[in-house]
């Protein structure tokens, strides 16, 4: 069986973080493993508290995984401290990790910074260059490319700049600022590929970024090329959103198990 590892925070509401990643990986038929970077107290209306793990404990989690069940793909999510980012980068290098998908969570779609400038610097210098592909939103791509993004032409220029600077492929998510469903994949030496999707009118979008990146990792784990993996991941997330799950008082989660019947008759 193919295997995938998520390195991310825990979401007590189950809609994002490692919970969303594990659900996504399982739905995409790969064996999911996790290394937790932080515990969060949160629900659909917001985050109440965050407790980070120590770099030593994160390293021990990664050692335990890589020395026993070597993952076919890895996805990393939000990691808020420079020390933890460096720990992840060191361990991925030590174990010659492959098929690394980095969701560079550092700037909210509102433009607010989610991690410190020091952590952003470590992310850019240590972790992102190890990635097979990174999945920034528009504000994150603006930070990485050091340019303003207002049009699809800007998206292409920014993605090319990031790719050339960091040496990894870039899946730049259009988001609501340009077009809800249009994402751009830029790979070095290849023509840019646009993924044009139909907008799904569902206000419950908690965990979409986590879900997309872990779905890409799942498909890479199964040996698919990057473009096909993105295509399959986009199809999966569209199905999860289209099921119109409605839970909680705020922006709720999507239905990760939309294709699971859940009946186990003899």
Task: Give, region by region, the residue ranges found by the protein language model.
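Conserved N-terminal subdomain of the carbohydrate kinase-like
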Residues: 3-6, 26-102, 106-109
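Short pre-catalytic strand/loop immediately N-terminal to key active-site residues, enriched for Gly-Thr
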Residues: 7-13, 192-206
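Glycine-rich anion/phosphate-binding loops
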Residues: 12-16, 79-89, 114-117
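N-terminal basic/disordered segments at the start of proteins
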Residues: 14-30
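Short, small-residue alpha-helix embedded
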Residues: 19, 142-143, 202-226
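Phosphate-handling active-site elements
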Residues: 29-33, 191-193, 219-233
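Charged C-terminal helix
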Residues: 52, 227-266
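Conserved phosphate/ATP/ADP-binding segment of small-molecule kinases
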Residues: 117-192
């Amino acid at each position: 069986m193919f295997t995938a590892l998520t390195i991310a925070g825990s979401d007590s509401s189950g809609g994002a973080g490692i919970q969303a990643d594990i659900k996504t990986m399982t739905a995409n038929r790969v064996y999911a493993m996790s290394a937790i970077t932080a515990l969060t107290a949160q629900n659909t209306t917001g985050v109440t508290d965050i407790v980070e793990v120590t770099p030593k404990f994160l390293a021990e989690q990664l050692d335990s995984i890589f020395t026993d069940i070597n993952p076919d793909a890895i996805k990393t999510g939000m990691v808020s401290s420079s020390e933890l980012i460096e720990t992840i980068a060191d361990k991925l290098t030590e174990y010659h990790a492959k098929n690394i998908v980095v969701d560079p969570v550092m700037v909210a779609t509102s433009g607010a910074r989610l991690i410190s400038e020091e952590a952003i610097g470590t992310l850019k210098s240590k972790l992102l260059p190890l990635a097979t592909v990174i999945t920034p939103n528009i504000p994150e791509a603006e930070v990485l490319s050091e340019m303003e993004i207002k049009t699809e032409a800007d998206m292409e220029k920014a993605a090319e700049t990031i790719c050339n600077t960091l040496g990894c492929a870039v899946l730049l998510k259009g988001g609501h600022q340009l077009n809800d469903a249009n994402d751009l994949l830029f790979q070095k030496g290849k023509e840019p590929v646009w993924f044009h999707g139909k907008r799904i009118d569902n206000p419950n979008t908690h965990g979409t970024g986590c879900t997309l990146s872990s779905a890409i990792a799942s498909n890479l784990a199964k040996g698919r090329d990057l473009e096909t993996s993105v295509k399959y991941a986009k199809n999966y997330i569209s199905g999860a959103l289209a099921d119109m799950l409605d839970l909680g008082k705020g922006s709720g989660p999507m239905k990760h198990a939309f294709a699971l019947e859940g009946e186990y008759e003899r």
